[in-house]
């Protein structure tokens, strides 16, 4: 697999993971390393900016197009990444009204 997914630089997603993949907690150590090391190739193949050169890359492109399910560790990791960045994150609070809680609490009378 040395020739497959060759890249010249590491992959960082500062928009979704400003502190890095390993510090965010969504990925295992191995998944973080794979995303950083091969993420540029994954992204280019997924967006069609790069032509697949090997059988592994051709299979990866077929997975990205939805022609087959994720089977390899690389495909499962990229699928997890795409799912995480495209899913809206929910934030839960203990307050009934977030704007009221942020304004300092108008229920307090101070008497």
Curated annotation (Swiss-Prot):
Superkingdom per UniProt: Bacteria
Effect of gene knockout: Disruption of the gene causes a slight decrease in transformation efficiency.
Pfam families from the UniProt entry: DUF413 (PF04219)
Cysteine pairings via disulfide bonds: none
Role: Involved in the organization of the Ori region of the chromosome into a macrodomain (MD). It constrains DNA mobility in the Ori macrodomain and limits long-distance DNA interactions with other chromosomal regions.
Family the UniProt entry places it in: Belongs to the MaoP family.
Protein name: Macrodomain Ori protein
Species this chain originates from: Haemophilus influenzae (strain ATCC 51907 / DSM 11121 / KW20 / Rd)
Classification lineage: Bacteria, Pseudomonadati, Pseudomonadota, Gammaproteobacteria, Pasteurellales
């Amino acid at each position: 697999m040395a020739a497959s997914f060759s890249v010249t630089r590491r992959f960082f997603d500062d928009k979704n993971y400003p502190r890095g993949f390993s510090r965010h907690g969504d990925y295992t150590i191995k998944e973080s390393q794979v995303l950083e090391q091969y993420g540029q190739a994954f992204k280019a193949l997924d967006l069609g900016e790069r032509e697949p050169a090997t059988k592994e890359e051709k299979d990866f492109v077929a997975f990205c197009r939805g022609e087959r399910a994720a089977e390899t560790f690389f495909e499962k990791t990229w699928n997890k990444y795409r799912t995480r960045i495209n899913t809206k994150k929910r934030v839960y609070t203990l307050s009934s009204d977030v704007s009221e809680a942020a304004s300092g609490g108008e229920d307090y009378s101070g008497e």
